Structures are given as C-alpha cells and as structure tokens.
C-alpha cells in the first residue's frame, strides 16, 4: 500500500526514528506529540494547559500539511503525567474540538521527557488515498 510521509515545514528533528505523520489509504496517523520546540526542548514547563495547546497546534500543523483539518480527527490517544492536570488538558482540548468530539482514551504514565506533562497521538480520516 502506498503511503506518504507528512512533515510540516519547521518541524524539528524527532527524538527517535519516526516521522510526524504518515498518510495511507486516506487515513493520517500522527505520531505521539510532545510539547517540544524545534530543538526538542520542553516548552511551557509546569503549565499543562499551555503544553496541551502547543501539542494540539503541532498536531494541527501535521493534519493541515496532509490536506485536512482538525474536524477530520477521529481518534486521540492522550497520555498525561499527572491526573491533577486532567481538567487543564480537557479545557484546552475542548477548544480544538468544539463540535462533534473524536473518540479518545486518556492514561496516566511517565513521558520520555521528564518535564513534559502531556503527549497526544492522533488519527484523522481525510477520505483520500496517499
């Protein structure tokens, strides 16, 4: 099956061997996205809401680079470091999905960068082949 790698302009080097997004058969898979700048430094340390906004803006850039919009996102995998941040994460998340919400799950776990508070991976259905 043909696939297309999606790397938005200005994307920093990934922390491991992966790409920001892969489009195959009209489905976009967005890699786990941390609140990182182009040099892989965590941004907005200690602020789960600001980190969530940064992560969702990064995901939005991947989806848009593939020709879609956030309305095309059908599933989100949310990883958070501390349940105490659940409300702040949800408040920002709701801004990006004001209409019909995508399916999702949310788990608490350790993240690869110790000061990161949230990571999100997404799936979007764009309705067009790679």
Curated annotation (Swiss-Prot):
HAMAP family: RutC. GO terms for cellular component: cytosol. GO terms for molecular function: deaminase activity. Keywords: Hydrolase. Pfam families: Ribonuc_L-PSP. Belongs to the RutC family. GO terms for biological process: nitrogen utilization; uracil catabolic process. It comes from Methylorubrum populi (strain ATCC BAA-705 / NCIMB 13946 / BJ001) (Methylobacterium populi). It comes from the Bacteria. This is 3-aminoacrylate deaminase RutC. The keyword Hydrolase applies. The keyword Metal-binding does not apply. Its EC number is 3.5.-.-. NCBIfam families: RutC. Involved in pyrimidine catabolism. Catalyzes the deamination of 3-aminoacrylate to malonic semialdehyde, a reaction that can also occur spontaneously. RutC may facilitate the reaction and modulate the metabolic fitness, rather than catalyzing essential functions. It is an enzyme of class 3 (hydrolase). It catalyses: (Z)-3-aminoacrylate + H2O + H(+) = 3-oxopropanoate + NH4(+).
